[in-house]
Amino acid sequence: MAGQGIVHTGVRALCDATGCAPGELQAWLGPCIGPSQFEVGADVLRGFGRDPEATWAQECFVPRSPGKWLADLPGLAREILSAQGVTLIQGGGDCTVSDASRFFSFRRDAITGRQAASICLR
């Protein structure tokens, strides 16, 4: 699936480079747009192998309005990491849009910056 992108590639590359199994890795999900704020279209659902024609909530996607869903980005990252065999996954609870006192957010303020996440050996 196209939506797996960097997480899938990162786990595979780290395991190839170190000879470890995915179960020997740990992941920390940094701050990001939260599931109550991240509105996406059908293209994003398709990229993660979901059916945009469905009218019910699908794992990590909740219908919001016609053609729009709320996406759980940390949930999607956890899903991809778990599917690859990574079992120790932490973080992902801080929403950059909702917490203006601690985080910048392009969607909220049109200000760019960087956040961090990590996948490493245990």
Where do the protein language model's features map onto the residues?
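Active-site microenvironment for binding and transforming phosphate-containing groups
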Residues: 1-122
